[in-house]
Design a protein with these regions (language model features):
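Pepsin/retropepsin-fold aspartyl endopeptidases
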Residues: 1-138
Length: 138
């Protein structure tokens, strides 16, 4: 009987490695616009996002947005929107990727409180749905 990895490989799925942090978050490495970054894989985040400090780092063209973000204990957070970026996770790529840009300091403060390195952003359900992701913890 074939195992899950062989089955998914046959269906053209691409394997993307992740690390489980001390906080039980999943950490994945990726690239936005060709620039490397570290991201939390956030199944509860509806949209992928990065912090304001990452605008230049990832070469984003971020524009004002009237949308307010909420999550991880915060609400009414000011946002910007960066459209049409390229994301690469492992060998999986998407060239029309939109990002929410907001103040991620509360996320990174929580990580550093547990002696975990800060992250550049969160990969959300938008990417997971687009890539038809299957998360295998084994």
């Amino acid at each position: 009987m074939e195992d899950l990895q062989d089955f998914l490989r046959g269906k053209k799925y691409k394997k993307i490695k992740f690390t489980v942090l001390k906080t039980q978050h999943l950490l994945i490495k990726g690239k936005i616009n060709g620039v490397k970054g570290n991201f939390i894989l956030g199944t509860g985040a509806s949209d992928s996002c990065v912090g304001f400090e990452s605008i230049e780092h990832f070469k984003l063209d971020a524009q004002f947005s009237e949308t307010k973000a909420a999550g991880a204990g915060a609400t009414g957070i000011e946002t910007q929107l960066a459209k049409n970026n390229e994301i690469q996770l492992g060998r999986w790529k998407n060239k029309k990727f939109h990002l929410i840009v907001f103040d991620m300091s509360h996320v990174n403060e929580a990580l550093t409180h547990y002696k975990t390195k800060p992250v550049d952003g969160i990969i959300g359900a938008d990417v997971l749905l687009k890539g038809k992701a299957i998360i295998d913890y084994s």
